UniProtKB/Swiss-Prot annotation:
Compositional bias per record (Polar residues), positions renumbered to this chain: 30-45
Gene Ontology terms, MF aspect: guanyl-nucleotide exchange factor activity
Name of the coding gene: SBH1
Name of the protein this chain belongs to: Protein transport protein Sec61 subunit beta
Membrane topology, record value: Single-pass membrane protein
Length: 91
């Protein structure tokens, strides 16, 4: 047996732990801290960005969105009525 007692792992293990801690700190500092920079609820590079102050995408007025959605609802109701009338007349 040797007369000097060595610490398990020695200086090499201590250097590895220190390097790993430094790498983890560097990785943590590179991560975005806000959910907006990560992409809240999904990807931040979506194909169509609607009405955010930061985006360079399409800016749509809320009135336009309301008119288009009401027009869509009206067209669906009209198609249902047309289908009912046509089945009663033809069949």
């Amino acid at each position: 047996m040797s007369t000097s007692a060595q610490v398990p792992g020695g200086p090499a293990a201590q250097m590895k732990r220190r390097n790993n801690a430094q790498r983890q700190e560097a990785k943590a500092s590179q991560r975005p801290t806000s959910t907006r920079s990560v992409g809240a609820g999904g990807s931040s590079s979506t194909m169509l960005k609607l009405y955010t102050d930061e985006s360079q995408g399409l800016k749509v007025d809320p009135v336009v969105v309301m008119v288009l959605s009401l027009g869509f609802i009206f067209s669906v109701v009209a198609l249902h009525i047309l289908a009912k009338v046509s089945t009663k007349l033809l069949g």
